[in-house]
Amino acid sequence: MAERPSASRQKAYRRGHRGEWLAAAALMLKGYRILARRHRTRFGEIDLIARRGDLVVFVEVKARRSLMEAMEAIGHESERRIEAAADIWLSRQADYGRLSMRFDMVAVLPWRWPVHVENAFYGRN
């Protein structure tokens, strides 16, 4: 029988879902269409995949106390994981050849509207 997650882990999970919901809402208000949430691959998970026109945006959502903390929370290992997962997702798209991609971050801060940071990091492509 599987153990129940601790109360703090459950709270973090709920906070993550709320943050991703807020981030998705902020992106939709900017004209993006959400294609996937918590997209899992063998390399890891992409929080949100959004599209506007021929631009596909792979979004890492960070709920932190400040924008600086959110930016610092994306390390090189996270970048590599997101890039590898993005490559897999893109390769499965029929219109792969005409799509542009970008790696963004949405910071979910206390009592503020989410902050969308375009080009939070640059992929190796």
From Swiss-Prot:
Taxonomic lineage from the root: Bacteria, Pseudomonadati, Pseudomonadota, Alphaproteobacteria, Hyphomicrobiales
Gene Ontology molecular functions: nucleic acid binding
Family to which this protein belongs: Belongs to the UPF0102 family.
HAMAP family in the cross-refs: UPF0102 (MF_00048)
Domain of life: Bacteria
Protein name (database record): UPF0102 protein mlr4633
One Pfam family recorded for the sequence: UPF0102
Signal peptide extent: none
PANTHER family per record: UPF0102 PROTEIN YRAN
